[in-house]
From Swiss-Prot:
The gene is gmk. PROSITE patterns: GUANYLATE_KINASE_1, GUANYLATE_KINASE_2. One of its GO terms (cellular component) is cytosol. Keywords: ATP-binding, Cytoplasm, Kinase, Nucleotide-binding, Transferase. It comes from Shigella boydii serotype 4 (strain Sb227). Its EC number is 2.7.4.8. This is Guanylate kinase. The keyword rRNA-binding does not apply.
Length: 207
C-alpha cells in the first residue's frame, strides 16, 4: 500500500487557510484525506469530542509524552499545551491516507526536521488591504487587536519561501482548485504510483 503524504499548511490569520482545508476535506473521501488531530491539556469545550476535535490529556500525560519525544511539535499557549503526535500521524499515513496539518511557521520548522518528506503549502492573501478587510469582517476585535494581528501576519508571511508550494487566496474557488491540484500532482509522483500499482507493473513487465 502506498504511504500517505503529510501536508503542512500555514498562513497568516485571515488568509482563509482553515476554510480552504475544510472545503477540500468535503470534496475528498475520508479514506483519502484527513486533518491532523492534536493533543491538548485544555478542557473540552461544549460539543468537542475526544479523538475527533482533540485528544484531551492532562498535564502529566502531556509532559510524559514530551519526555519520550512523542510529538512532532508542541507549544504552550496561555497555560495549555498543544502538540502533534508522531505516532498518530504515522498510523494514518501508513494506511495510505493523506494528512493535513494546520500549523504556524515555527511548528512547520519543527516538523520538517522530524519528517523531511512532508510537503508544505503556504497561503497568502491577495493584499494587505484585503487582509485588513477580512480581519475586520469578523467584527469581534478592537483596533489594537487588529493592528497586532496585522503585525503578526506580516511576520508570518516573511517565511513564505520556506515552503514547497505557494497559493494566493484572491478567489476562493481558484485557491481551492490550486490546493486540489497540488494533492493530485503529489499522488501521481513516481514513488507513490509504483507502490500503488506494484501488482499491475509486475504483470505488465512479466515475460
Amino acid at each position: 500500500m502506498a504511504q500517505g503524504t503529510l501536508y503542512i499548511v500555514s498562513a497568516p490569520s485571515g488568509a482563509g487557510k482553515s476554510s480552504l482545508i475544510q472545503a477540500l476535506l468535503k470534496t475528498q473521501p475520508l479514506y483519502d484525506t484527513q486533518v491532523s488531530v492534536s493533543h491538548t491539556t485544555r478542557q473540552p469545550r461544549p460539543g468537542e469530542v475526544h479523538g475527533e476535535h482533540y485528544f484531551f490529556v492532562n498535564h502529566d500525560e502531556f509532559k510524559e509524552m514530551i519526555s519520550r519525544d512523542a510529538f512532532l511539535e508542541h507549544a504552550e499557549v496561555f497555560g495549555n499545551y498543544y502538540g502533534t503526535s508522531r505516532e498518530a500521524i504515522e498510523q494514518v499515513l501508513a494506511t495510505g491516507v493523506d494528512v493535513f496539518l494546520d500549523i504556524d511557521w515555527q511548528g512547520a520548522q519543527q516538523i520538517r526536521q522530524k519528517m523531511p518528506h512532508a510537503r508544505s503549502i503556504f497561503i497568502l492573501p491577495p493584499s494587505k488591504i484585503e487582509l485588513d478587510r477580512r480581519l475586520r469582517g469578523r467584527g469581534q476585535d478592537s483596533e489594537e487587536v487588529i493592528a497586532k494581528r496585522m503585525a503578526q501576519a506580516v511576520a508570518e508571511m516573511s517565511h513564505y519561501d520556506e515552503y514547497d508550494y505557494l497559493i494566493v487566496n484572491d478567489d476562493f474557488d481558484t485557491a481551492l482548485t490550486d490546493l486540489k491540484t497540488i494533492i493530485r500532482a503529489e499522488r501521481l509522483r513516481m514513488s507513490r504510483q509504483k507502490q500503488r500499482h506494484d501488482a499491475l507493473i509486475s504483470k505488465l513487465l512479466a515475460d
